[in-house]
Design a protein with these regions (language model features):
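N-terminal juxtamembrane cytosolic/stromal segments of multi-pass membrane proteins
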Residues: 2-69, 241-256
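Selected alpha-helical membrane-embedding segments in polytopic membrane proteins
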Residues: 39-129
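Hydrophobic alpha-helical transmembrane segments and adjacent short intramembrane/lumenal linkers
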Residues: 101-105, 109, 118-228
Length: 256
């Protein structure tokens, strides 16, 4: 007999191995061609961080990523200054330049204060990321946060021109900052997950530290929304105590 068909048992195809740790999506960075395209300038960095965050994460791993990091920091400073001008319109006068300087400077200082702890937590978690890559991810966090704040700026300006409540304006800016921070931390978490870290415990701890540092920085650089006799405070306060004191301020009298 001429049997042209095999008689052996049918063997099912092998089950593909699970994705390696640090790649929750199952796709390593740079697998798609568009992720490997360079990001030439700050404008392209804004477009990439909003539409193609994986492209930013991949480029931060490549040699010569300093230009991208500088571009994202430039975007963060520029957007912070613009949003700070909007914040300063509530009180006017000196705050038109003081608020932008304090917001941009405070955000950068907070990031620099928290950068060493993030790198240490990354190393303890088994991450293979270089310090430059971690610094780039933090720059991306700041850029995305401030870009979102620019999106909220028209709403903040409207309320700053139509209300005299310092507590309400402070709460509104905190809400906008909180929303922007959530999205920024999502970007940072996604980038952190691609560094082969075995645990997120260190990253989650760092998030708490970063939020506390930024909140305390707003108190250390007060006043940002309102006005005071000096540009910087002469009294040390915890940010919660400062919020409580703001709520106790007398309400402004209604205009005739």
């Amino acid at each position: 007999m001429n049997d042209t068909h095999p008689t052996g048992p049918l063997v099912p195809p092998p089950i593909p191995p699970p994705p390696p740790p640090g790649y929750p999506s199952g796709r390593p960075l740079g697998e798609l061609p568009e992720e490997r395209e360079p990001i030439p300038n700050a404008v392209a960095a804004v477009e990439a961080i909003l539409r193609q965050p994986r492209r930013v994460m991949y480029q931060l791993r490549q040699p010569g990523s300093g230009g991208l990091i500088a571009g994202m920091l430039f975007v963060a400073v520029l957007c912070s200054v613009v949003y700070g001008v909007v914040v300063g319109t509530f009180s006017g006068g000196v705050q038109l330049w003081a608020a932008p300087v304090k917001i941009a400077g405070g955000l950068l200082i907070s990031a620099l204060i928290c950068l060493p702890s993030l790198y240490i937590f990354a190393c303890l978690s088994g991450s293979q990321a270089r310090l430059a890559e971690i610094f780039g991810l933090v720059a991306g966090l700041l850029a995305l946060m401030t870009i979102l704040l620019i999106g909220f700026a028209p709403v903040a300006w409207l309320f700053s021109q139509s209300t005299e409540s310092l507590a309400w304006m402070g709460a509104l800016h905190l809400i906008f900052w909180g929303i922007a921070t959530v999205f920024g931390l999502r970007f940072l978490n996604a980038g952190f997950s691609h560094t082969q870290a075995r645990s997120n415990a260190g990253f989650n701890t760092w998030v708490v530290i970063f939020v506390l540092v930024v909140l305390q920085m707003t108190t250390a650089l007060r006043p940002i929304v309102g006005t005071a006799e000096t540009l910087l405070p002469e009294e040390k306060k915890f940010f919660v105590s400062h919020w409580v004191d703001c709520l106790k301020l007398p309400k402004p009298k209604a205009r005739d």
